[in-house]
Amino acid sequence: MANQKVAPLADRVVVKPLEEAEQMRGGLYIPDTAKEKPQQGTVVAVGPGRFEKETRVPMDVKVGDKILYGKYSGTEVTIEGEALLILRESDVLAVIN
């Protein structure tokens, strides 16, 4: 699993984006060029937090949280065939309960 292979630094979070539907409700298939980037996913790894005045600030998100993030946030990476997104905690807009 990716969380054992990736150890984010500082206030970074590794997210597995939600898979998009390949097919619309009406049965039509959506080409890759027409698909929108996902804006939610599951946290698979969390950094230790950022430093502020020589004190480490703990992270607000944890592994397993479902989150919403900005459409163009983070850096897309592929690790062992798994598509992941590395973003800063400040790019996380909300945690989905």
UniProtKB/Swiss-Prot annotation:
Function: Together with the chaperonin GroEL, plays an essential role in assisting protein folding. The GroEL-GroES system forms a nano-cage that allows encapsulation of the non-native substrate proteins and provides a physical environment optimized to promote and accelerate protein folding. GroES binds to the apical surface of the GroEL ring, thereby capping the opening of the GroEL channel.
PANTHER family per the UniProt record, alphabetical: 10 KDA HEAT SHOCK PROTEIN, CO-CHAPERONIN GROES
Coiled coil: none
The keyword Chaperone appears for this protein: yes
Lineage: superkingdom: Bacteria
Keyword Chaperone included in the entry's annotation: yes
Source organism of the structure: Gemmatimonas aurantiaca (strain DSM 14586 / JCM 11422 / NBRC 100505 / T-27)
Gene that this sequence comes from: groES
Keyword terms of this UniProt record: Chaperone, Cytoplasm
Name of this protein: Co-chaperonin GroES
Principal subcellular localization: cytoplasm
GO cellular component terms attached to this protein's record: cytoplasm
